[in-house]
């Protein structure tokens, strides 16, 4: 996971999800993983950012993307949900002005296979690839803190 490489992580269950708190350099970081179904996660994410008074433009949502090759990473600010039900839910609750870190999981080939594909576990080699990406994201958080998108992507894509 993104937080597994961090030291002194304090976790708690609150606001409909799991919150992890840790220091990254001089910054206090909070991560949130909703306990809701993907298509309803916007409700708990809205509770989280409202409770801590975060502005949406300080939020980074990390999500899977069928339209990207496995392990490919893209980052963007704002925009459409691209058909992703989790993003649709978030958009409906907090608007579209937040960062999205998209991690490719490959498209299964036909629309009929999409639900099964996104709900199934990764195969062994796929899991290794995704874990490597998460580790590189964790290692390079400082670039996100400084909004250095290009440098972040270069490091994460290695």
Locate predicted features.
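Nucleotide and nucleotide-moiety/phosphate-recognizing core
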Residues: 1-77, 88-99, 109-113, 128-158
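Active-site oxyanion-binding pockets that recognize sulfate/phosphate
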Residues: 123-127
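Short glycine-enriched, charge-decorated loop/helix-capping segments at active-site entrances
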Residues: 74-80, 118-122
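Short, conserved glycine- and acidic-residue-centered signature motifs
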Residues: 83
